[in-house]
């Protein structure tokens, strides 16, 4: 395998940290080890993010940098680039876990992971910078809202 292929593969792996599956596993894991408040905050934030992004993508479709084909309403929404759901979920995880654990080293580690995740979406040509920025802003707003409401 060529070096460039390995790098691309690594970025695809990192990008999975913002996927629905990873976040669902994180929520279930937090619940199972007794972190029920964190689990609930993550669940509310991710569901809220999902619905807001779905509404935005329903009314404002933007092709990804590498255009994807779609043949149904849901695949069209998934093919839309704006805003980045991965960025939104990455920021949500960063803020909620950092606030819950209040640990500088964990916050620095999560910040690094989130930056790499965000960069991976650009590198893999899944989003434009403005998609990433909008997703990140949405993640911040939702996280702050959830921290205020879900206590």
Predicted regions and their residues:
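N-terminal transmembrane-helix/juxtamembrane module of multi-pass inner/ER membrane proteins
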Residues: 1-25, 37, 53-79
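Structural signal for the C-terminal ends of transmembrane alpha-helices
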Residues: 2, 6, 29-36, 100, ...
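Alpha-helical transmembrane segments of integral membrane proteins
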Residues: 15, 37-45, 106-109, 130-134
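Interfacial segments of alpha-helical transmembrane regions
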Residues: 28-52
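Membrane-embedded catalytic cores of phosphoryl/pyrophosphoryl-handling enzymes
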Residues: 70-151
